[in-house]
């Protein structure tokens, strides 16, 4: 066979495939070799980098890998800020960092760039597990960090995830094992570390805490301590915040190794941005809402954030101002909202040109809203650090912004000292009298018309008073000098809610306290930093149905009035005076809250009272477990008694039975029975008469309606086809347009209308004459009573047909046409 035959061509193709495989393998080897060389060169540049060099002005001056550099260029990040110039070189060298810088100074990139570089130099893949963990105190800030990470890391092959509350725990757990970088909130992350099987953090390379002072605060202390226990000691830790803590106890909890303290603005004249104009207004507590309303009405073409101390206040002011329509779009944001709603509101405010956002401190830290013109603080912040974070939502990235703080006269002196200590200078301004407008009457009208709004106003009042009462800084917050009656009146409330005070705890601890008891069993994180406890018992559909709650704002208030809200809301414990408590529920609460042990100190069995007469002996562990379930304790309770009330309001049992002696005093049983039968027969006879009269009246009305209907039908038949009717301009009564013509005398009749009226009373066979008919005696009628048409006559060469009646249907018109066509 020739060399060019099939066999030769097959051998040639096989050789080409082998050469192609060899080229690919060689190409991979060369590519791997180049990557190793690039990594060695990059590491060499990092080792030679001087962190204190003043020549670092752009990201291109830093020793960064190509994927990170290209991602920064594509996101239009070119020039380094002060905190980035100081922190990134140290982080690239692997040192722990404790960073503090002004709000809006670019701290997010200061830790995201080192995270990407650390994993890139380690050649991290999805099989290596979690490499970097970024913790944020709020969901909004976590979402923002994740979006920035996606932008600058678009050219990397790392997998990144966002783990926050408000989403399905099961769906997150399925994907968690494949993540290289996680952005999370403390509570949800700890929940995954405790519950998600196969989630391994032993290879963690870097831990980042944004707004670290807030994360290490009292509310997150347990979550952070438990979370750090799961993490390896050999990791790099970065802490960033606008107000950083240097306490040794905080740093020891996080196991920092010789941290570098980076504070680029520590020696600056002010702790707030240079372009921020800061003012404060001294306004009494009852006039705060009036001042806020006047401010919004004069700044309709602005983007405004209004901070308040509690979510109840945010909801009340938003609902009331929305009904009054100030002329600017209104939004509200607080920690009790669902995650989907919070994201939607955040996006709407971000994209809006002019808008006003009422918010709590959930957006006070780190969240970047573009082009915010004003930051208004209606309530005095708890400390100067909170003030700095709040005003930092405007004047970001060297732009300009303005901030206004409302202070009660009792708060002015003390809080200005706190601001001066933090290098914050604010100027006092006065409100023009023509800009003030009292809205107390409008709020009172709204509260009167809407019970929902009234009860929401009561909740807002209680939450504000509670926040002031629990403040630690008594030099600033002087509770006794506040005009609470005037404040309640300014909210539109009919009176001042009664509040019972008890000795409070630390305000931050209560503010960030876990609400696991309120929402246990849910797989979503109810608020930032809280720890959820999952129910172990099986919940049937009947249990779920019994646990359903009305979502109306009145529901919790009503439950509290009934004493059924003991564990519903930790925020309001011991602050609303309970006017009425159900005995059974109180007994169940007392039984459920008794001592853990089932025996008394003397060894006797413990007896728990479940009411006035019912008792439960705790003589076993099974009986002791009953105390934890109100549902199981119900069968040991006394049976309820149904009562009826007489006309005087006195309660009586529904079936009030006599004893034997009282019954015998009334006489013989047979006579009593006969009297009862006779009395009932009399009642039946009286009722029978009324029923017969009613039936007779209904039959009479039915006959009258039938007769009226028949008369109407007869009148319609006599009238024939409908004639057009004229309506007088000043009357609704129809008038016959031909009535005037009928009243005129007919030619040749002498104006006598007596004959015409007599003709109207002719037998039914003969129809009444019309206005155009002549009074001829020779009129002929057909069998059906209709006048016959006379023969046609010739007048002046024209054919004329005389009609005895006006055509009133199609049959008459056809007969007239046939007569005209005859010769």
UniProtKB/Swiss-Prot annotation:
<dbReference type="GO" id="GO:0042802">
    <property type="term" value="F:identical protein binding"/>
</dbReference>
<feature type="domain" description="Helicase C-terminal">
    <location>
        <begin position="288"/>
        <end position="443"/>
    </location>
</feature>
<dbReference type="Pfam" id="PF13959">
    <property type="entry name" value="CTE_SPB4"/>
</dbReference>
<dbReference type="GO" id="GO:0032040">
    <property type="term" value="C:small-subunit processome"/>
</dbReference>
<comment type="subunit">
    <text>Interacts with the U3 and U14 snoRNAs. Associates with pre-ribosomal complexes.</text>
</comment>
<keyword id="KW-0694">RNA-binding</keyword>
<feature type="compositionally biased region" description="Basic and acidic residues">
    <location>
        <begin position="13"/>
        <end position="34"/>
    </location>
</feature>
<dbReference type="GO" id="GO:0005730">
    <property type="term" value="C:nucleolus"/>
</dbReference>
<keyword id="KW-0067">ATP-binding</keyword>
<dbReference type="GO" id="GO:0003723">
    <property type="term" value="F:RNA binding"/>
</dbReference>
<feature type="domain" description="Helicase ATP-binding">
    <location>
        <begin position="88"/>
        <end position="262"/>
    </location>
</feature>
<feature type="compositionally biased region" description="Basic and acidic residues">
    <location>
        <begin position="703"/>
        <end position="720"/>
    </location>
</feature>
<dbReference type="InterPro" id="IPR011545">
    <property type="entry name" value="DEAD/DEAH_box_helicase_dom"/>
</dbReference>
<dbReference type="GO" id="GO:0016887">
    <property type="term" value="F:ATP hydrolysis activity"/>
</dbReference>
<feature type="short sequence motif" description="DEAD box">
    <location>
        <begin position="210"/>
        <end position="213"/>
    </location>
</feature>
<dbReference type="GO" id="GO:0006364">
    <property type="term" value="P:rRNA processing"/>
</dbReference>
<feature type="compositionally biased region" description="Basic and acidic residues">
    <location>
        <begin position="680"/>
        <end position="694"/>
    </location>
</feature>
<feature type="region of interest" description="Disordered">
    <location>
        <begin position="1"/>
        <end position="34"/>
    </location>
</feature>
<dbReference type="InterPro" id="IPR014001">
    <property type="entry name" value="Helicase_ATP-bd"/>
</dbReference>
<feature type="region of interest" description="Disordered">
    <location>
        <begin position="680"/>
        <end position="810"/>
    </location>
</feature>
<dbReference type="Pfam" id="PF00270">
    <property type="entry name" value="DEAD"/>
</dbReference>
<feature type="region of interest" description="Disordered">
    <location>
        <begin position="511"/>
        <end position="549"/>
    </location>
</feature>
<keyword id="KW-0378">Hydrolase</keyword>
<feature type="short sequence motif" description="Q motif">
    <location>
        <begin position="57"/>
        <end position="85"/>
    </location>
</feature>
<dbReference type="InterPro" id="IPR000629">
    <property type="entry name" value="RNA-helicase_DEAD-box_CS"/>
</dbReference>
<feature type="binding site">
    <location>
        <begin position="101"/>
        <end position="108"/>
    </location>
    <ligand>
        <name>ATP</name>
    </ligand>
</feature>
<keyword id="KW-0539">Nucleus</keyword>
<comment type="function">
    <text>ATP-dependent RNA helicase required for ribosome biogenesis. Involved in the release of U14 snoRNA in pre-ribosomal complexes. Required for pre-rRNA cleavage at site A2.</text>
</comment>
<protein>
    <recommendedName>
        <fullName>ATP-dependent RNA helicase dbp-4</fullName>
        <ecNumber>3.6.4.13</ecNumber>
    </recommendedName>
</protein>
<dbReference type="GO" id="GO:0005634">
    <property type="term" value="C:nucleus"/>
</dbReference>
<keyword id="KW-0698">rRNA processing</keyword>
<keyword id="KW-0547">Nucleotide-binding</keyword>
<dbReference type="InterPro" id="IPR025313">
    <property type="entry name" value="SPB4-like_CTE"/>
</dbReference>
<feature type="compositionally biased region" description="Basic and acidic residues">
    <location>
        <begin position="793"/>
        <end position="808"/>
    </location>
</feature>
<dbReference type="GO" id="GO:0003724">
    <property type="term" value="F:RNA helicase activity"/>
</dbReference>
<dbReference type="Pfam" id="PF00271">
    <property type="entry name" value="Helicase_C"/>
</dbReference>
<feature type="compositionally biased region" description="Basic and acidic residues">
    <location>
        <begin position="539"/>
        <end position="549"/>
    </location>
</feature>
<dbReference type="InterPro" id="IPR027417">
    <property type="entry name" value="P-loop_NTPase"/>
</dbReference>
<dbReference type="InterPro" id="IPR001650">
    <property type="entry name" value="Helicase_C-like"/>
</dbReference>
<comment type="similarity">
    <text>Belongs to the DEAD box helicase family. DDX10/DBP4 subfamily.</text>
</comment>
<keyword id="KW-0347">Helicase</keyword>
<dbReference type="GO" id="GO:0005524">
    <property type="term" value="F:ATP binding"/>
</dbReference>
């Amino acid at each position: 066979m020739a060399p060019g035959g099939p066999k030769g061509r097959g051998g040639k193709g096989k050789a080409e495939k082998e050469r192609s495989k060899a080229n690919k393998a060689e190409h991979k080897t060369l590519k791997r070799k180049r990557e190793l060389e690039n990594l060695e060169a990059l590491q060499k540049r990092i080792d030679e980098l001087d962190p204190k060099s003043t020549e670092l002005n752009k990201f291109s001056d830093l020793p960064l890998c190509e994927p990170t550099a290209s991602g920064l260029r594509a996101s239009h990040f070119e020039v380094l800020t002060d905190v980035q110039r100081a922190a990134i070189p140290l982080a690239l060298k692997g040192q722990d960092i404790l960073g503090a810088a002004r709000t809006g100074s670019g701290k997010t990139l200061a830790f995201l760039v080192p995270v990407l570089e650390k994993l890139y130099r380690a050649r991290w893949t999805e099989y290596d597990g979690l490499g970097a963990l970024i913790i944020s105190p709020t969901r909004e800030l976590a979402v923002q960090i994740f979006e920035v990470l996606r932008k600058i890391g678009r050219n990397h092959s790392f997998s990144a995830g966002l783990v926050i509350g408000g989403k399905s725990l099961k769906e997150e757990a399925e994907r968690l094992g494949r993540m290289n970088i996680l952005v999370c909130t403390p509570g949800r992350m700890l929940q995954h570390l405790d519950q998600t099987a196969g989630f391994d953090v032993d290879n963690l390379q870097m831990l980042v805490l944004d707004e670290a002072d807030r994360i290490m605060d009292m509310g997150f202390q347990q979550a952070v301590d438990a979370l750090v226990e799961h993490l390896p000691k050999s990791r790099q830790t970065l802490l960033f915040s606008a107000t950083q803590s240097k306490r040794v106890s905080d740093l020891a909890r996080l196991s920092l190794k010789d941290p570098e303290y980076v504070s680029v603005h520590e020696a600056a004249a002010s702790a707030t941005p240079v372009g921020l104009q800061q003012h404060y207004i001294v306004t009494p507590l009852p006039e705060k809402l009036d001042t806020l309303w006047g401010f919004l009405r004069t700044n309709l073409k602005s983007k405004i954030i209004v901070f308040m101390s509690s979510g109840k206040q945010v909801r009340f002011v938003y609902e009331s101002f929305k009904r009054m329509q100030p002329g600017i779009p209104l939004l509200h944001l607080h920690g009790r909202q669902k995650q989907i709603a919070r994201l939607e509101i955040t996006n709407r405010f971000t994209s809006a040109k002019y808008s006003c956002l009422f918010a709590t401190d959930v957006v006070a830290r780190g969240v970047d809203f573009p082009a915010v013109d004003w930051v208004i603080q209606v309530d005095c912040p708890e400390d100067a650090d909170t003030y700095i974070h709040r005003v930092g939502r405007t004047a970001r990235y060297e732009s300009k912004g303005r901030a206004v703080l409302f202070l009660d006269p009792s708060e002015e002196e003390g809080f200005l000292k706190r601001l001066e200590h933090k290098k914050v200078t604010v100027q006092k301004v006065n409100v023009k009298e023509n800009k003030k407008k009292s809205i107390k009457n409008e709020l009172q009208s709204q509260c009167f018309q809407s019970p929902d709004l009234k009860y929401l106003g009561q909740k807002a009042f209680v939450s504000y008073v509670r926040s002031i009462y629990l403040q630690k800084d008594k030099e600033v917050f002087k509770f006794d000098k506040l005009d609470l009656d005037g404040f309640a009146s300014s909210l539109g409330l009919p009176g001042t809610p009664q509040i019972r005070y008890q000795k409070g705890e630390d305000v931050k601890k209560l503010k960030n306290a876990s609400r696991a008891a309120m929402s246990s069993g849910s797989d979503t994180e109810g608020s930032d930093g809280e720890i959820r406890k999952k129910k172990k018992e099986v919940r049937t559909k009947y249990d779920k149905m019994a646990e359903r709650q009305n979502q109306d704002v009145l529901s919790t208030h009503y439950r509290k009035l009934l004493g059924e809200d003991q564990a519903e809301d930790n925020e309001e414990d011991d602050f609303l005076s309970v006017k009425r408590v159900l005995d059974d529920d109180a007994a169940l609460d007392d039984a459920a809250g008794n001592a853990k042990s089932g025996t008394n100190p003397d060894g006797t069995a413990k007896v728990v009272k479940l009411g006035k007469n019912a008792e439960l002996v705790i003589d076993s562990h099974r009986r002791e477990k009953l105390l934890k379930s109100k549902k199981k304790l119900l069968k040991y309770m006394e049976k309820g008694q149904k009562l009826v009330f007489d006309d005087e309001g006195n309660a009586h049992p529904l079936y009030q039975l006599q004893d034997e002696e009282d019954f015998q005093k009334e006489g013989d049983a047979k006579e009593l029975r006969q009297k009862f039968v006779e009395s009932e027969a009399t009642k039946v006879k009286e009722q029978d008469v009324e029923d017969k009269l009613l039936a007779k009246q209904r039959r009479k009305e039915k006959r009258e309606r039938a007769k009226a209907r028949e008369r109407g039908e007869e009148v319609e038949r006599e009238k024939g086809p409908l004639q057009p009717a004229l309506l007088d301009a000043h009357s609704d009564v129809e008038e016959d347009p031909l009535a005037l013509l009928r009243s005129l005398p007919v030619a040749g009749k002498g104006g006598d209308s007596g004959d015409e009226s007599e003709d109207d009373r002719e037998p039914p066979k003969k129809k009444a004459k019309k206005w155009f008919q002549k009074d001829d005696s020779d009129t002929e009628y057909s069998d059906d009573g209709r006048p016959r048409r006379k023969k046609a006559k010739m007048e002046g060469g024209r054919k004329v047909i005389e009609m005895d009646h006006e055509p009133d249907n199609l049959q008459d018109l056809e007969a007239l046409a046939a007569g005209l066509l005859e010769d």
